[in-house]
């Protein structure tokens, strides 16, 4: 089974790359494989970090990168934090594992500073609490503190806000943005939540069935997207000022990676599908000659022609980009 195919990206310092898609699209397994966390994975290609290929590194060298230069935040902090050890001790252990010159006292002081940095109240006291004594939002903040303990150049955040309510989610995202501004950290944000993408991402990759469907900057993805899957994800979301009586879910289910359909993997669910989609797999290429906006779709890149196809197939045209932007800004919802 090929879980991910043809994935390529780069992340600059101080920028955030968002990777979005449904469950099983290959979002998480791609970064976990790059960091050597998927046993038995067969990988081709390169993953360059500071000029070195992470995919060919030995386990010892990779261990020196993980935590120190690349921090990771996982979806469930309760399962990521050891229940038998105090939160502060776990952060201190991370520091001392990678900084052999740090004493216990120095590591503890750094742990307290980190907890304060991510907004944990009374950090000098909470440093001695166990994970079960923290709320869900506080545990996630503690995971961010641990991931940022050594000021990594890159932070991989794998669904870090999924289990949090909207208020706590906003607080956690603000903590990450503040840390990014302070330290110039590059972030890879993996999520199925387009609201999170709208809040934090500079560039966005949309994945489906292990492949990239579309890649562009945030504004283009939200207002001038080209791929029907991206369009479907956005149309299935409720929005402020939306007067629709019903949401528009994407029909069907994602395919099994063991038995992918021929042609475009999205064609069984696509409202625009035509014969070529069923037999030929489109390459990821520029939309209308724009090399910063890539899409893997056989639809015309000209928006007017594409809307004509939409009207022919499903009876109404999609608003043009200027109209969509004006409507969003009138509702106060500019991404």
Language model region names:
Residues 52-53, 105-125, 234:
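Conserved ABC ATPase "signature" region
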Residues 149-153:
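A short, proline-enriched helix->beta-strand linker immediately N-terminal to the Walker B motif
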Residues 121-125, 215-329:
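Short catalytic/signature loops enriched in Gly
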Residues 1, 54-71, 97, 104, ...:
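ABC ATPase NBD coupling module
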Residues 43-53:
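Conserved ABC transporter NBD signature motif
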Residues 36, 154-160, 164-246:
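P-loop NTP-binding/switch modules centered on Walker-like glycine-rich loops
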């Amino acid at each position: 089974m090929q879980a991910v195919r043809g994935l390529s990206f780069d992340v600059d310092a101080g920028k955030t790359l968002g990777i979005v898609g449904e469950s099983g699209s290959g979002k998480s397994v791609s970064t976990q494989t790059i960091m050597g966390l998927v046993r038995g994975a067969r990988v081709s290609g390169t993953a360059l970090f500071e000029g070195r290929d992470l995919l060919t590194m030995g386990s010892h060298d990779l261990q020196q990168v993980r935590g120190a230069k690349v921090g990771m935040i996982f979806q469930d902090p309760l399962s990521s934090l050891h229940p038998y050890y105090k939160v502060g001790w776990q952060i201190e252990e991370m520091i001392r594992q990678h900084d052999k010159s740090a004493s216990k006292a120095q590591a503890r002081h750094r742990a307290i500073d980190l907890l304060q940095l991510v907004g944990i109240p009374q950090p000098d006291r909470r440093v001695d609490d166990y994970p079960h004594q923290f709320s869900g939002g506080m545990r996630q903040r503690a995971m961010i503190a641990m991931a940022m303990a050594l000021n990594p150049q890159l932070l991989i955040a794998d669904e870090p806000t999924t289990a949090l309510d909207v208020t706590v989610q906003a607080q956690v995202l603000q903590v990450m943005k503040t840390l990014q501004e302070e330290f110039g950290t590059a972030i890879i944000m993996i999520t199925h939540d387009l609201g999170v993408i709208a809040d934090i991402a500079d560039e966005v990759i949309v994945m489906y069935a292990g492949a990239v469907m579309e890649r562009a900057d945030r504004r283009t993805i939200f207002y001038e997207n080209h791929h029907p899957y991206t369009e479907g994800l956005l149309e299935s979301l409720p929005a402020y000022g939306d007067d629709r009586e019903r949401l528009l879910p994407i029909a069907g289910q994602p395919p099994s990676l063991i038995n992918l359909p021929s042609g475009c993997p999205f064609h069984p669910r696509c409202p625009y599908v035509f014969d070529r989609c069923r037999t030929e797999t489109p390459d990821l290429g520029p939309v209308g000659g724009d090399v910063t906006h890539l899409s893997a779709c056989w639809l015309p890149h000209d928006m007017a022609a594409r809307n004509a196809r939409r009207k022919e197939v499903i009876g109404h045209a999609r608003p043009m980009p200027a109209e969509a932007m004006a409507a969003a800004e009138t509702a106060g919802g500019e991404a």
